[in-house]
Amino acid sequence: MKKHIRTLSVVPLAALAVSVCALYPTKTEIFTREPTDYKNAAVRLTAPSEPDTSAENITDPKSAVLDKVLNTIDRLDHVCMTARTNMIGDGETTLTFNVDISAGLSHQSVAENGVTVSETYSDTNMGMVSIDHRTKRYTPDCLPVYTRSDTPYIPLDERITYEDGIPCYRYRRNITNCPLASYCLVPQELAFSVLSDTGSWEMSDEPVIHPDTGRSCVVITGVPSDYFAAKHGIDSFSMSVDEETGVILSFEGKKNGDVVIFTYATEFDTATETPVGRFDAAAFADYTPTAR
């Protein structure tokens, strides 16, 4: 997948606000999973230049939902989440996130077939450490870490703009510091991919209860763009959006009514202040540290 970018305001990989494993690349290989709907999209990353705000006064229901999905980080602090997805590897992957944004701590684990294959620990004071259990290696300071002060709110009309007919997307930094949070917890990429055209989807009139988490959510159904449909082999999609936070509790891409791609949350808790684990090098004495 080779893409060229027309405009890019921030170029160093270490400075990117989104994870290198995110599901939404633009015209560069910044993101390694999924391409955007729009082949010619450019990406913007916001520098910390203004205080954080929120847009609670959006009156259009669809725009309000889109804004909420793009800004989950404003409504999250303590969060524990587990989700299953087939959008990362060849099979099903289980993602677990434990985050305390105020404390600057997070832990992400990735499991395949019930076996944890990788972990990421983040501490805004100490940096981020990535652990690969398959190779028994760990990498200190594998990615930069961010706090709330690094990512001001961006008004919705500035998130998606067009230059010569080419859509340009502005991202906020992923302050959960979990590299795979883009699949559900900080789903900016997915929002840009399937929700930016508000004429292509509809949402439920009344909230429904998500069966696995018990959360009140909005159900969205729609038709993907031609590019997104061709990439994933789907002709429709549906998702459940947590009404309070905008987090994606489920996403399904379907072909002729059959599910092709999915992400399903099995746990989502924002009320319990679960202690977040920290990296302890002594626990990995038989692992090999590698340079970034």
What are these regions (language model features)?
Residues 153-204:
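Solvent-exposed helix/loop surface patches that form functional interfaces
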Residues 2-105, 134-166, 197-199, 207-209, ...:
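N-terminal leader/targeting segments and the immediate start of mature chains
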Residues 40-44, 56-59, 175-183, 224-229:
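A broad, low-specificity signal for short, low-complexity segments enriched in glycine/proline
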Residues 122:
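Detector for the Zn2+-coordinating histidines of canonical Cys2His2
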Residues 83-119, 127-129, 196-291:
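Gly/Pro-enriched, hydrophobic low-complexity segments
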